[in-house]
Amino acid sequence: MLMPKRVKYRRVHRGRMKGKALKGNTLTYGDYGIQALGSCWLTANQIEAARRAMTRYIKRGGNIWIKVFPDKPVSKKPIGIRMGSGKGAPEYWVAVIKPGRVLFEMAGVPEDVAREAMRLAQHKLPIKTKFIAREEFGEKDGEADEN
């Protein structure tokens, strides 16, 4: 599972997710990708589940790039503990996703295989996403999927 090796601060504020993604909103490595249409916290487990779904479908062909990294710790206090006495221990790690962010990229497979693999991965994610392709492969942006 993805998580940082070491961090400067163990606990961080929740922050706000406003605006669009200014970085990471274009395809850089692959020919096809999944682009976020909404904002969310994407957990390390969700990223891994989507990666496994794509990898198992394309079998040995093609490359997959994960373009997001969960670098934000989310803390949680144990059940049955009274309020106060500081912030809880880090429970899991999330990546902050804004609209327009490319989550995964893929290359080395035909478009129909990439589209189906990305569709399987989209079902593992908590936000609406869309399939995108490079300009030289015909269409620029695919249609929006429900999940």
UniProtKB/Swiss-Prot annotation:
Top-rank taxon, per record: Bacteria
A Pfam cross-reference name: Ribosomal_L16
Cellular component GO terms held in the UniProt record: cytosolic large ribosomal subunit
The UniProt record lists the keyword Secreted: no
InterPro entries: Ribosomal_uL16, Ribosomal_uL16_bact-type, Ribosomal_uL16_CS, Ribosomal_uL16_dom, Ribosomal_uL16_sf
Keyword terms: Ribonucleoprotein, Ribosomal protein, RNA-binding, rRNA-binding, tRNA-binding
Keyword RNA-binding: yes
GO biological process: translation
Annotated CDD domains: Ribosomal_L16_L10e (cd01433)
MF term (GO), any: tRNA binding
Family, as annotated: Belongs to the universal ribosomal protein uL16 family.
Assembly and binders: Part of the 50S ribosomal subunit.
Function: Binds 23S rRNA and is also seen to make contacts with the A and possibly P site tRNAs.
Protein's name according to its UniProt entry: Large ribosomal subunit protein uL16
